[in-house]
Design a protein with these regions (language model features):
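Intrinsically disordered, low-complexity segments enriched in small/polar residues
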Residues: 69, 134, 149-150
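DPxDG-like acidic metal-binding loop motif
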Residues: 87-140
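N-terminal subdomain of lithium-sensitive/metallo-dependent phosphomonoesterases centered on the IMPase/IPPase/PAP
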Residues: 1-97
Length: 153
């Protein structure tokens, strides 16, 4: 999705293509999360006393690669790695494991969060709950059904 197609996906006219792209991201993040979940792992502590694991770092890197491959001119900001600045005016914000403490304790109540913004205005949101197989996507004025059983967002 580069060039003209990239711009079309960013437009209001192609929310479906953007939602389809976002619904494909669990294929990137879930295998990593499931590999690390309840496997025992070292925990590091950030300056704000929040925990971070190798799973957090690995998931964020994989999602950054997927986003950069499709949207190379966009900003990518995350919790665990340096910001990547682009020129498109669009930006992706990643929280690879929201609920790291639950993840560390082996509780399946955490998720991967991604947002798309332009000039500070939210355009799309993604919530994936990998251990319960639920993924939710919302794009601009379009809301999609949950991927699991059609529960409305």
């Amino acid at each position: 999705m580069t060039g003209q197609h990239q711009n079309r996906v960013h437009s209001q006219l192609d929310n479906v293509a953007l939602a389809d792209f976002l619904y494909g991201l669990p294929a990137v993040s879930r295998p990593i999360i499931r590999e690390w979940f309840r496997s025992g792992h070292d925990v590091e502590w950030k300056a704000d006393d929040s925990p971070v694991t190798m799973a957090d770092k690995s998931v964020e890197l994989a999602l950054r690669e997927a986003l950069a491959a499709q949207f190379p001119d966009d900003d990518i900001l995350g919790e665990e790695h340096a910001d990547q600045r682009g020129t498109s005016g669009y930006g992706w914000v990643i929280d690879p494991i929201d609920g790291t403490r639950a993840f560390i304790c082996g509780r399946p109540v955490f998720g991967t969060l991604i947002g798309l913004v332009r000039d500070g205005v939210p355009l799309a949101g993604f919530i994936d709950m990998p251990m319960v197989d639920e993924c939710y996507v919302a794009c601009l004025l379009y809301t999609s059904d949950a991927a699991d059983e059609g529960h409305c967002v």
